[in-house]
């Protein structure tokens, strides 16, 4: 291994006179006893989330040709950049980059690395938590509407009420102290993600046998066809968000010179990506083939029969998002707790920890209640912040730290990913922002199977 560059030596999170080791208290590095299957289910939980349910809708906005190309290309590129980050986790002897921003400091410099990575990573993790609040609320509402059906049984409960119900569980789960303490929750969440994805495409396939003519051409929705196309690119990008927590997951795995953490981490990541492919490709392709351009923003909203199975699928989504929210919230807790103790000199107490975490849950809940627009949030955040942290920043750091030979295969692959990611970051948020503005102006709330009175 290479020596540690001068600009990243002695990067301590704790002041020299600190009477304890902060790393042993922070949620990311407090426990290092994970293994490859921890890596597998943490990555499945992190990657397979709200994005998979919106893939058929994204396909309807892109069309068969572009949709399949973007779907496959995104899977390949993000697997490659995930491998890069795993390799760079401990590329210098005696140094582990346990957090995304620490690797950014190694590549861009101590200050510039923070300025580049921290805002983007925070935006990703906060936006994921907001979208998961919305998706959890939507799924609970679907369960409610399917169970009661149309007519007099319908209540006046709106999606905002169900977001509040979903958020109440997060106040409890946020009390789990570190990454390894949420392993059980994450494992259940990973199983749930595979389960509801399977139900979604199998139920769609079953419905397809009885469906009449289906149209696959572009259809104007809330925005023009070109803007919808751009929006769909962001929705595709949102489906691959695991890079923002991959180093934090790897930090929980022990490492020795004989058995570096990258081996079990990569093994788990490969297993996770095989599972991701099993979830994403059937849902996207079968869902679009069955419903065409009439598919709803979430594939589960297009499915009504068999009612009991669709209700179960929606509950699986809720259970999965309970764990997935925590996987993305934990690095945010880690950052805030570190700053509060190291810079503002707060004592590391349970009161501090609970206050930080409950404030964060309440903030994401409030934003979700105010902006419950699933597809628009997916496309805007997917392009604006997911494209940089997932598609091209890992490649830029690889070029800086690994320095591959110019015009070599590695050099060319990285520049292709950088250009692809930059284009995605520039054009995708345009469609998402247009859709978000339209929904806010019209006051459009997600569809309901119950005919609720308008106020």
Curated annotation (Swiss-Prot):
Amino acid transporter. Residues 1-38, 83-113, 180-181, 248-267, 329-357, 401-412 are cytoplasmic. Pfam families: Aa_trans. It comes from Arabidopsis thaliana (Mouse-ear cress). It comes from the Eukaryota. The keyword rRNA-binding does not apply. This is Lysine histidine transporter-like 4. Residues 60-61, 135-158, 203-226, 289-307, 379, 434-455 are extracellular. The keyword Membrane applies. It is a multi-pass membrane protein. Belongs to the amino acid/polyamine transporter 2 family. Amino acid/auxin permease (AAAP) (TC 2.A.18.2) subfamily. Keywords: Amino-acid transport, Cell membrane, Membrane, Transmembrane, Transmembrane helix, Transport. The chain crosses the membrane at residues 39-59, 62-82, 114-134, 159-179, 182-202, 227-247, 268-288, 308-328, 358-378, 380-400, 413-433.
């Amino acid at each position: 291994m290479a020596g540690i560059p001068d600009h990243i030596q002695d990067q301590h999170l704790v002041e020299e006179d600190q009477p304890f080791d902060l790393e042993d208290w922070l949620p990311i590095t407090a426990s290092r006893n994970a293994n490859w299957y921890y890596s597998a289910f943490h990555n499945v939980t992190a990657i397979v989330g709200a994005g998979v349910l919106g893939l058929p809708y994204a396909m309807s906005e892109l069309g068969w040709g572009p949709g399949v190309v973007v779907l496959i290309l995104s899977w390949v590129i993000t697997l490659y950049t995930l491998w890069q980050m795993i390799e760079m986790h401990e590329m210098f002897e005696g140094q582990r980059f346990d957090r995304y921003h620490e690797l950014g400091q190694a590549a861009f410099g101590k200050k510039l690395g923070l300025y580049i990575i921290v805002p983007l990573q925070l935006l990703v993790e906060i936006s994921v938590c907001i979208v998961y609040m919305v998706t959890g609320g939507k799924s609970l509402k679907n369960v409610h509407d399917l169970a009661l059906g149309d007519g007099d049984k319908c209540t006046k409960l709106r999606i905002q009420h169900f977001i509040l119900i979903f958020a109440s569980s997060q106040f409890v789960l946020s009390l789990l102290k570190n990454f390894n303490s949420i392993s059980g929750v994450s494992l259940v969440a990973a199983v749930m993600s595979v389960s509801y994805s399977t139900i979604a495409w199998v139920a769609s396939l079953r419905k397809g046998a009885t469906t009449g003519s289906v149209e696959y051409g572009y259809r104007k929705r809330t925005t023009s066809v070109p803007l919808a196309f751009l929006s769909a690119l962001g929705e595709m990008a949102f489906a691959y968000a695991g890079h923002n927590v991959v180093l934090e997951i790897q930090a929980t795995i022990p490492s020795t010179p004989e058995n570096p953490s990258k081996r079990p981490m990569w093994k788990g990541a490969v297993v996770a990506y095989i599972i991701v492919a099993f979830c994403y490709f059937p849902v996207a392709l079968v869902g679009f083939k069955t419903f065409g351009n009439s598919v709803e923003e979430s594939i589960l909203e297009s499915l009504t029969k068999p009612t009991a199975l669709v209700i179960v699928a929606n509950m699986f989504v809720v259970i999965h998002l309970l764990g997935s929210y925590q996987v993305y919230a934990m690095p945010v807790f880690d950052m805030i707790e570190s700053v509060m103790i190291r810079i503002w000199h707060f004592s590391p107490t349970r009161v501090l920890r609970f206050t930080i975490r409950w404030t964060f849950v309440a903030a994401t809940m409030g934003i979700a209640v105010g902006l419950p627009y699933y597809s628009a949030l997916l496309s805007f955040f997917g392009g604006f912040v997911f494209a940089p942290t997932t598609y091209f920043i890992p490649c830029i750091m690889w070029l800086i730290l690994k320095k591959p030979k110019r015009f070599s295969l590695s050099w060319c692959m990285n520049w292709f990913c950088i250009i692809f990611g930059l284009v995605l970051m520039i054009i995708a948020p345009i469609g998402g922002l247009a859709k978000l503005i339209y929904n806010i102006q019209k006051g459009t709330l997600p569809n309901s199977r119950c005919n609720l009175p308008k106020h």
